[in-house]
Structure formats: C-alpha cells, structure tokens
UniProtKB/Swiss-Prot annotation:
It comes from Brassica rapa subsp. rapa. SMART domains: ChtBD1. It comes from the Eukaryota. Keywords: Allergen, Chitin-binding, Disulfide bond. InterPro entries: Barwin_dom, Chitin-bd_1, Chitin-binding_1_CS, Endochitinase-like_sf, PR4, RlpA-like_sf. This is Chitin-binding allergen Bra r 2. Residues 1-26 form the Chitin-binding type-1 domain. Pfam families: Barwin, Chitin_bind_1.
Amino acid sequence: QAGGQTCAGNICCSQYGYCGTTADYCSPDNNCQATYHYYNPAQNNWDLRAVSAYCSTWDADKPYSWRYGWTAFCGPAGPRCLRTNAAVTVR
C-alpha cells in the first residue's frame, strides 16, 4: 500500500509504491510493504503458510523469533507491520 493504493492479488509494494514479487518489492530490508498485514500470529499459530499473504511462503521457514520481530503487532497496530527489533537477523 502506498499513497492509499494497494497492489492487486496480495503482491508486494515497494517503498516507492510499485507492485512486484522480487526482493526489491517484498524485502523489508528495502523498506517494502510486504503483505504481512494479513498475518494474525495468534490466530494462525505463527504459521506463515496458513495465511493469505503473497510473500508468506518465502519466509515460512524462518525461526519464530524472526517472524515475531516483523509480525507480532500487525493486528493491534493496523494494516501494516512494525519493525520491533525483537529479533536479530544473521546474514
């Protein structure tokens, strides 16, 4: 979502408001708006495959700590995910 617009088909939105499916559009490291706002962690038992989010299966095997860091507050915070710094990313 950018400027009130959303990408069709639950695909990702880049930091500049363009839709796509590559890391340029989906990676939170690029300030992108991946579709994790559809992810309700408590309701879905932290299972990214159980939700209707386009990019979810790419990150479904990440550790729980990584998923918590990006999605724990999506429900209460509204239609966007917040970086909480609750997890450390190892590259």
